Structures are given as structure tokens and as C-alpha cells.
Amino acid sequence: SGAAAAQTAAASSLHQASNHTFYPWMAIAGESTADPIKSKIRSDLTQYGGISTDMGKRYSESLAGSLLPDWLGTNGLRRRGRQTYTR
């Protein structure tokens, strides 16, 4: 249901992230689609935005299964270790 999905998205942005919560920006990064239109959009994103050189492509492919799209930077959606943001 749409309300439950919106509630899950709101809760996932407030609380700590787990592997099973849905983030709204995960729809951008999805590789599991067989839709040629979406894959064309994704290939345009990887070609024109972010890392587009062969060196960058090899670097992003050498990150073994990082689940991050290669147009995200190194500090894109990562968690830092035990860092306190507010005191």
C-alpha cells in the first residue's frame, strides 16, 4: 500500500538504516530492472554525469559489488564508523 510505503520511507530517513528499509533514492540506483527505457536513462547518467573516463569505470567496477551507483562519489551514501554528529 502506498501509505505504508510512505511511512516506511519517512521512518527510514529518521531512524537508523537497515538493509531492509526502502529509501526513495534507491529507485535511481536500481540495476534489477529489465526496462530498456530505464536502463537507457541509467546509461546516460553514467555516461554524462559523474565518472565517465575509462579509469573511472575501472575504478568503480573494482569496488567489488558495492551496491552504489558509480556516479555517486566515494562518500555518497556511506556510514561513518562511530562518529558523533551532535554533542
Swiss-Prot record:
In the embryo, expression is seen in the epidermis, somatic and visceral mesoderm, and the peripheral and central nervous system. Signal peptide: none annotated. It is found in: Nucleus. Sequence-specific transcription factor which is part of a developmental regulatory system that provides cells with specific positional identities on the anterior-posterior axis. Binds the consensus region 5'-TTAAT[GT][GA]-3'. This homeotic protein controls development of the cells in the posterior thoracic and first abdominal segments. It activates the synthesis of the decapentaplegic (DPP) growth factor. GO terms for molecular function: DNA binding; DNA-binding transcription factor activity. One of its GO terms (cellular component) is nucleus. A motif (Antp-type hexapeptide) lies at residues 22-27. The gene is Ubx. This is Homeotic protein ultrabithorax. Belongs to the Antp homeobox family. Keywords: Activator, Developmental protein, DNA-binding, Homeobox, Nucleus, Transcription, Transcription regulation. InterPro entries: Homeobox_Antennapedia_CS (IPR001827). PROSITE patterns: ANTENNAPEDIA. Transmembrane segments: none annotated. The keyword Transcription applies. It comes from the Eukaryota.
